[in-house]
């Protein structure tokens, strides 16, 4: 059973979370985690002006996802930073290339799940995940979130990402904060949870 983790990251937070999601997937017997990134759509000049050039080198070795790989996966977990409370345009562009999967119903009945990051605590993590879910529903996917059985999302001991909609991390106003242990635990939990549900959905 193949669980595809397809992400966009500009500064590395979503990449780090994607690695943790993959760990969670791999903790399920028979589940293979495949990490892919979506194509970059901004020019090198714009990326340099945004201070992304060095950061993106950390995950340049991850292969770029193809639409066929998306269609062939047993479950898909999407990771995107928030952009004004929505998914990043790079992810949007990738989704807009999947029309033929919609036509053929390739994703119907497969588990789909979303995780995110933002600079500020209330900067749109929930709206990013929930508006992403609309796309999954149009593709006929079965939406999987991050249940409250992941107790780390209820903690009052620290400022943390994570909601019933999906794992998340807060990068901080300058983007210098890295995903906390609790946020990474949420990402691992989500990966494991999706893989467990996908295993049930794919059982004959
Ligand atoms: C154009 C743009 C819009 C953004 N919009 C938001 C926003 O609405 N709320 C917020 O908290 N952070 C916002 N951010 C910050 C990003 O979400 C943050 O850089 C990202 O989550 C870090 O993830 P990454 O390291 O994987 O790129 C924005 C960043 C950019 C470049």
Curated annotation (Swiss-Prot):
Transmembrane segments: none
Keyword Cytoplasm among record annotations: no
Name of the top EC class for this enzyme: oxidoreductase
Binding site for NAD(+): 11
CC cofactor note: Binds 1 FMN per monomer.
GO molecular function: flavin adenine dinucleotide binding; FMN binding; NAD binding; NADH:ubiquinone reductase (non-electrogenic) activity; NADP binding; NADPH dehydrogenase (quinone) activity
Lineage top rank: taxon: Bacteria
SUPFAM superfamilies listed in its UniProt record: Flavoproteins (SSF52218)
Gene Ontology CC: membrane
Entry-linked NCBIfam families: flav_wrbA (TIGR01755), PRK03767.1 (NF002999)
Protein name from the UniProt record: NAD(P)H dehydrogenase (quinone)
